[in-house]
Amino acid sequence: MDPSTLMILAIVAVAIIVLAVFFTFVPVMLWISALAAGVKISIFTLVGMRLRRVIPNRVVNPLIKAHKAGLNVGTNQLESHYLAGGNVDRVVNALIAAQRANIELTFERCAAIDLAGRDVLEAVQMSVNPKVIETPFIAGVAMDGIEVKAKARITVRANIERLVGGAGEETIVARVGEGIVSTIGSSDNHKKVLENPDMISQTVLGKGLDSGTAFEILSIDIADVDIGKNIGAILQTDQAEADKNIAQAKAEERRAMAVAQEQEMRARVEEMRAKVVEAEAEVPLAMAEALREGNIGVMDYMNIKNIDADTEMRDSFGKLTKDPSDEDRKS
């Protein structure tokens, strides 16, 4: 092959390699698109983005969109927000939506909201089109002991100024639930709540529950009201059952004490009987001693024996004539 031909082929190969490397590092088509859209951006700026590990189309495309919308946003602002981990496209879309809705929103504020983890585009849309939050059934007990369940619909609008650091929807729902329970609990009876559900919404709405949150409460509407359990009757029943158990326990305690006292009395009776038997055993000894010393005579001793015999005879008659019903009652 002719050396001149080889030289031409080598030059062509080198040119192809150089062009491939050039188009790899320099997004020419993106640069042309920016120029066609009227965005003045240097090709060296795009190369610098490559070197700073910034994907050029993630910055240039939102820049073109912002330029067409008439926003005063620079390349450095978008690139710095991208390097900070923000969503450049969502920020630009939020700025465009805010401009169309005549909402005052700067790029710095929008970028701060995005970096805080909030969906700034959704917040702008919610400022234009308020969101309805529906709570579950919230139960409260009126003063007459009847449980009342209420479901509310809360219409909120995003507060752009409080998106950073403001509480979310969960706080709104919790505060509204607390207000509903408090309003129902302060009602004299459940019929007032059923007759005038607006009383709940008006009372809750007047408490300023959106303080410190990222939302502004526009209205609170009671969607449904239902009657629950008779909590007062249940509590009274439980109290009566508890009182009954306490009374039974006290009665059982008194019965046990009575049984113990009865056993104690029986023991004392047996003790007294033992003492009587012991004393009776000493009587013959005392009589013998009296006879020995001459304190009593033989006739006195015989009279005593006759009296004992009469007493034993009367006891035997009494046992024979005792009423059987007395034995049944004792048994």
From Swiss-Prot:
Q: Motif EA repeat 4 in this chain: where?
A: 288-290
Q: Does the keyword Transmembrane apply?
A: yes
Q: Which Pfam families match?
A: FloA
Keywords of this protein's UniProt record, alphabetized?
Cell membrane, Membrane, Repeat, Transmembrane, Transmembrane helix
Motif EA repeat 2: which ranges?
Answer: 251-253
Q: Where is this region: Required for correct localization?
A: 236-331
Please state what the protein is called: Flotillin-like protein FloA
Source organism (scientific name): Bacillus subtilis (strain 168)
Q: Gene of origin?
A: floA
